[in-house]
């Protein structure tokens, strides 16, 4: 695992989607701790476009809507939480459940159970017939130490520059080198206080004749910021961005000097939009996840959120193989399911990045033009003129372009400025600027093939996903195979606690490879449940049955005990309908109560029947589990 001294700003996450917060609800209160620790939503719900942080506002976009705060489609809402803070919380929770975090080397011993090594870098991988021998390097007290770690599986979740990916020769496909940027991590409580009371927001797009940049407000209360600025090598070099130079640029963007500014770190980085050509190598024993498998523009928080989705999909499949529940053939379904999502999110993040460029383009600063000018200089005079002259030429052209942002031009009394400001307003009104939330892609993404029984259309073809829109679409709950199980509050029918209300998502085990069968309390569904439990038991598969009682019609005495005997792994629940949504569970799922839903350990629907199983139920369920787990 990489060093705990994680660079805090390069590609730091600024938004945790609801799907991710739902996952974290199962990790011993992690979601609740994030909700408590994040800044108040009023401090981060807006993106602000301005001429300087203390100057005039060109416009702002509020990215939170009323439905983002209710619990109709999700038991939790989105969160604003930096990646390095999340890493610290994850380590804290791992230690709380018995894991040991170590920074020193192994000293020729084996890696112990529940032991995590920090500060170790993978330097080589050597597959053998039985294991993968991984060589790691670390530095302890100034000494360079190598360790040999044999492992059955190696998951390369080692970032965008993945060593594991490079060692096994997996190529990335997509759009490379979209933009080169400098990221400046700095602190200023003075600026934080001002923005907190005068212009609270998450992102600030700043355009003025002196400088252009995007400021990420990670924590206004603490005064922690990340400034992102494009740069154009070789005329502009990273070495030019010294601490003093960055301070001067920050002051131009703020509108005045800051007395307490502290530049913590300055890093260059390159924006890409790429997905690995494959996710598995070496007989499916080396697996890529997270940024190692895909690199997105940092527009919309797709990188970290997609990476956590990868881990959530992979974890139960690896556990199923290790526990002997499923054969190795289930592992390719990880790539079958996750890679199409990464490709979709790549397209969506590119569209969102292009939307981010719409405002500067409307103001007369089309980034495509800047890139073209830079390319012309490189391809024509680059080999003739001295580097200092090239730099002066490029800086002069860019300064001339930024002059269009002067108060003389950019005002309502200037016909050109008025026209440009009107274009910007239309962009905001039509929702065509950079978006923060994508509810349909957050909760509504669906696996089309893999560890599931897919549904086909009336012509016998698999149902295809809608193309990315680049704009906010609302999430519509679905019980289609491959979809995430819809959320609904339910009351657990228990003789001990009669008022325990949970989400349907809480019915799935958080620490076992266990499937969930949801049925209504009717005879045909009980018979189906008997068969499912019997077939699962024959294959060492855990299944819990959830009997969904309709709201207001539950017979408290007519429990499932006698109907499912001798099986005991079941739970009776009753719908808890919201005042703003009176739909029944089966209405939400667009099914009749005679249907049934089989849910995987990662909360995704593996199989469903809309009304009743036709034919031999035992044969059908054997086919279902074979399709899901790859059983022979």
Question: Where is each model-derived feature located?
Answer:
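C-terminal helical "tail/cap" subdomain of flavin- and related membrane-associated enzymes
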Residues: 319-476, 509-514, 530-538, 630
């Amino acid at each position: 695992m990489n060093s705990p001294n994680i660079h805090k700003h390069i590609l730091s996450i600024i938004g945790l989607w609801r799907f991710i917060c739902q996952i974290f609800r199962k990790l011993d209160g992690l979601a609740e701790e994030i909700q408590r620790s994040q800044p108040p939503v009023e401090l981060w719900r807006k993106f602000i476009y301005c001429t300087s942080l203390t100057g005039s506002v060109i416009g702002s976009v509020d990215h939170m809507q009323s439905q983002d705060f209710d619990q109709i489609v999700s038991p939790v809402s989105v969160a604003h939480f930096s990646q390095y803070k999340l890493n610290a919380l994850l380590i804290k929770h791992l230690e709380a459940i018995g894991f040991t975090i170590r920074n020193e080397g192994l000293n020729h011993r084996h890696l112990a159970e529940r032991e995590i090594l920090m500060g170790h870098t993978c330097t080589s991988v050597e597959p053998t017939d039985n294991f993968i021998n991984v060589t790691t390097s670390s530095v302890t007290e100034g000494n360079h130490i190598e360790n040999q770690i044999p492992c059955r599986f190696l998951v390369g979740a080692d970032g965008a520059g993945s060593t594991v990916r490079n060692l096994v020769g997996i190529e990335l496909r997509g759009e490379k080198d979209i933009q080169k940027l400098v990221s400046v991590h700095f602190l200023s409580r003075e600026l934080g206080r001002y923005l907190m009371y005068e212009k609270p927001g998450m992102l600030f797009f700043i355009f003025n004749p002196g400088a252009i940049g995007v400021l990420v407000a990670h924590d206004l209360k603490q005064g922690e910021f990340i400034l992102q600025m494009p740069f154009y090598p070789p005329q502009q070099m990273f070495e030019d961005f010294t601490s003093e130079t960055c301070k001067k640029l920050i002051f131009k963007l703020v509108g005045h000097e800051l007395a307490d500014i502290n530049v913590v770190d300055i890093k260059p980085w390159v924006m890409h939009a790429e997905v690995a050509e494959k996710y598995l190598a070496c007989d499916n024993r080396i697996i890529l996840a997270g940024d190692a498998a895909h690199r997105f523009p940092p527009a919309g928080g797709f990188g970290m959120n997609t990476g956590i989705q990868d881990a959530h999909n992979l974890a139960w499949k690896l556990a199923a193989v290790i526990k002997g529940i499923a054969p190795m053939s289930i592992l390719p379904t990880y790539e079958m399911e996750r890679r199409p999502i990464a490709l979709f999110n790549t397209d969506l993040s590119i569209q969102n990045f292009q939307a981010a460029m719409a405002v500067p383009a409307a103001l007369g600063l089309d980034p495509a033009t800047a890139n073209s000018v830079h390319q012309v200089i490189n391809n024509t005079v680059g080999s003739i003129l001295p580097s200092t002259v090239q730099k002066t030429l490029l800086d002069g052209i860019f300064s001339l372009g930024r002059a269009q942002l002067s108060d003389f031009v950019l005002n309502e009394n200037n016909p050109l400025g008025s026209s440009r400001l009107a274009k910007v307003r239309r962009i905001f009104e039509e929702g065509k600027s950079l978006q923060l939330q994508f509810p349909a892609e957050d909760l509504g993404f669906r696996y089309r093939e893999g560890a599931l029984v897919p549904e086909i259309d009336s012509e016998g073809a698999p149902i295809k996903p809608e193309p990315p829109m680049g704009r906010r679409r609302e999430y519509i709950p679905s019980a289609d195979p491959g979809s995430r199980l819809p959320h609904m509050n339910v009351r657990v029918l228990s003789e001990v606690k009669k008022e325990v209300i949970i989400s349907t998502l809480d019915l799935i085990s958080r620490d076992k490879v266990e499937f969930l069968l949801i049925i209504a309390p009717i005879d045909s569904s009980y018979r189906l449940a008997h068969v499912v439990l019997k077939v699962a038991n024959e294959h060492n598969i855990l299944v819990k049955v959830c009997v969904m009682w309709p709201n207001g019609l539950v017979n408290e005495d007519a429990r499932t005990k006698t109907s499912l005997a001798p099986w005991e792994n079941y739970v009776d629940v009753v719908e808890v309908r919201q005042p703003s949504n009176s739909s029944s569970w089966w209405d939400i799922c667009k099914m009749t109560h005679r249907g049934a839903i089989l849910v995987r350990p990662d909360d995704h629907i593996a199989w469903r029947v809309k009304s009743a199983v036709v034919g031999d139920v035992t044969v059908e369920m054997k086919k279902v589990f074979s399709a899901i787990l790859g059983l022979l």
